[in-house]
């Protein structure tokens, strides 16, 4: 796993590799964007991770905003109950590459790593 950029005080941790990749994706879009992270019902294990870029002004009073060297992650408080302590990492490996979620709240995860159960 890559070195963490975030401090333990942040509810969602972000590795240096994930931050670097997110900044590159943001630059490709050519506008100011942040990453919204959340959960929804579904997936092999009961809950699925959600990630998408959005404009920072879309954050509401029901969201928590985490700043990583000028890049923001937004998470609604309900999802944060399931994601608190999550480590988001990135690997460019040919097999098993992409974003990887390490969730301390998950009692079970599926083989693909994109869903979990609590």
UniProtKB/Swiss-Prot annotation:
A GO-annotated cellular component: cytoplasm
TM regions (residue ranges): none
PROSITE patterns linked: HESB
Gene Ontology terms: biological process: iron-sulfur cluster assembly
Pfam family, one: Fe-S_biosyn
A single MF term (Gene Ontology): 2 iron, 2 sulfur cluster binding
Superkingdom to which the source organism belongs: Bacteria
Family listed: Belongs to the HesB/IscA family. Ycf83 subfamily.
NCBIfam families per the UniProt record, alphabetical: iron-sulfur cluster assembly accessory protein
Protein name per UniProt: Uncharacterized protein slr1417
Species this chain originates from: Synechocystis sp. (strain ATCC 27184 / PCC 6803 / Kazusa)
High-level lineage: Bacteria, Bacillati, Cyanobacteriota, Cyanophyceae, Synechococcales
């Amino acid at each position: 796993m890559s070195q963490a950029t975030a401090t333990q005080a942040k509810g969602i941790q972000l590795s240096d590799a994930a931050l670097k990749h997110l900044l590159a994706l943001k630059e490709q879009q050519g506008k100011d964007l942040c990453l919204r992270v959340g959960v929804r019902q579904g997936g092999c294990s009961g809950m699925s991770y959600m990630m998408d870029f959005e404009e920072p002004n879309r954050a509401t009073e029901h969201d928590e905003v985490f700043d990583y060297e000028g890049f923001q992650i937004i998470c609604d408080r309900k999802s944060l109950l399931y994601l608190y302590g999550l480590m988001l990492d990135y690997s460019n490996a040919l097999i098993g590459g992409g974003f990887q979620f390490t969730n301390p709240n998950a009692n079970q995860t599926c083989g693909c790593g994109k869903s979990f159960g609590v």
